[in-house]
């Protein structure tokens, strides 16, 4: 979408994805939260680059995408959340996901939900996501 699209104007934070042409920022920060798509930070290989960015920006929560896999991980006191994808999930479960995140200081609570029924995702969906990311890492070596 172009920068002046009326839909984009509804949001305070917008970042560029790997298929966007518009000059959106690669990341934005807000109250110790970093938001990025993740494609410029090697998220398929791990979080080393995002850890550096979050440390530089004094962020303890990082929201990212790119892998289309719902995950929550903690590295070096930084919580990384990928909500998955609403329409193009990469798991065997056959539905999109989103995350609801409650932040109270450094206390972070994350719930992953089915994008159509809004039901909570079961832990096996998150476990499958972690296994899938490990497979991606091995394939990309």
Protein language model annotation of sequence segments:
Residues 1-30:
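Core catalytic region of metal-dependent phosphoesterases/phosphodiesterases
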Residues 74-141:
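Acidic, His/Gly-rich catalytic cores of divalent-metal-dependent hydrolytic chemistry
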Residues 12, 33, 110:
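Hydrophobic anchor at the start of a short beta-strand
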Residues 5-6, 26-27, 47-48, 74-77, ...:
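Short amphipathic alpha-helical segments
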Residues 70-72:
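Residue-level recognition of beta-strand microenvironments
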Residues 4-8, 50-54, 98:
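Short amphipathic alpha-helical segments and helix-helix/interface helices
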Residues 21-57, 87-92, 122:
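Active-site-proximal segments of metal-dependent phosphoesterases and phosphodiesterases across multiple
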Residues 13-18, 35-38, 61-66, 81-84:
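Active-site neighborhood of phospho(di)ester-bond hydrolases with catalytic His/Asp-centered motifs
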């Amino acid at each position: 979408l172009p920068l002046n699209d009326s839909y984009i104007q509804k949001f305070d934070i917008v970042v560029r994805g790997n298929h966007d042409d518009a000059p959106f920022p690669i990341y934005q920060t807000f109250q110790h939260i970093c938001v990025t798509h993740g494609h410029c930070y090697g998220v398929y290989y791990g979080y080393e680059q995002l850890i550096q960015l979050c440390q530089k920006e004094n962020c303890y929560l990082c929201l990212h995408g790119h892998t289309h896999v719902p995950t929550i991980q903690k590295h070096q006191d930084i919580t990384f959340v990928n909500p998955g994808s609403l329409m193009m999930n990469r798991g065997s479960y056959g539905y999109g996901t989103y995350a609801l995140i409650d932040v109270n200081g450094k206390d972070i609570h994350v719930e992953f939900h089915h994008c159509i029924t809004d039901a909570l995702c079961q832990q096996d969906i998150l476990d499958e996501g972690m296994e899938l990311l490990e497979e991606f890492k091995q394939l990309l070596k």
